[in-house]
Design a protein with these regions (language model features):
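Binding-site signature for planar aromatic cofactors or substrates
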Residues: 2, 7, 44-48
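Beta-sheet-rich sandwich/jelly-roll-like modules and their strand-loop junctions
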Residues: 15-17
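Conserved N-terminal beta-strand and adjoining loop/helix that marks the start
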Residues: 29-41
Length: 189
């Protein structure tokens, strides 16, 4: 685990475990969300906080209100993965993180997926409900939003045009296109 000394960036490295893969030996998509949550918790611990109010100086909870992940290249059993967290947005009552997943097996890291997670600051109510509240000052004063040049712009577009995906697209054989002619018969281009 590394904390870059900046309260907007964190990275953790881990390996894909056998129990995290499917029958094809590929990491199940749901585990990307587990990796994101685990990185968020490690980020908070590195800053001296906990994401649960019961074990920290924070009197609120931070439930997930939005989660997404775009996949470019599958991860497999025993792949080494770097999970990088950046604070994309710090709102008055929420935090949004960007995640980048890079496979570290080769000589150069390969980005395999990108994720985004938004958490809201809430106070638990006696009736079991939740009430949105401002981020605690201890968090709001410490955690910062990452500089714009570090954030991914065009979130989906860039992960879908990863070098690996572009290489596979170029290597794919061209398919014949069938179009109807004027007389109703199909011709192949």
């Amino acid at each position: 685990m590394t904390h870059a000394g900046m309260p907007y960036e964190f990275q953790v490295t881990r390996h894909v475990e056998f129990s995290e893969t499917d029958l094809a030996g590929i990491m199940h998509f749901s585990n990307f969300f587990r990796f994101m949550e685990s990185a968020e918790h490690a980020f908070f611990r590195s800053l001296g906080f906990s994401v649960t109010g019961s074990r920290s100086r924070i009197a609120v909870c931070l439930p997930r209100v939005h989660a997404e992940c775009d996949y470019a290249v599958p991860l497999r059993f025993e792949d080494e993965v770097l999970v990088r967290l950046l604070v994309e947005r710090k709102g008055r009552r929420s935090l949004t993180y960007q995640f980048r997943f890079c496979r570290l097996n080769g000589s150069t890291p390969e980005e395999v997926a990108r994720g985004r997670l938004t958490v809201a600051s809430v106070e638990l109510q006696a009736n079991g409900g939740m009430k949105a509240v401002p981020l605690p000052k201890v968090i709001a004063n410490y955690i910062q939003q990452a500089p714009a040049h570090m954030l991914v712009d065009g979130f989906r577009a860039k992960v879908n045009s990863s070098p690996a995906r572009e290489r596979r697209r170029r290597e794919r054989p061209k398919r014949a296109i069938r179009t109807p002619s004027r007389n109703g018969h199909h011709k192949t281009n």
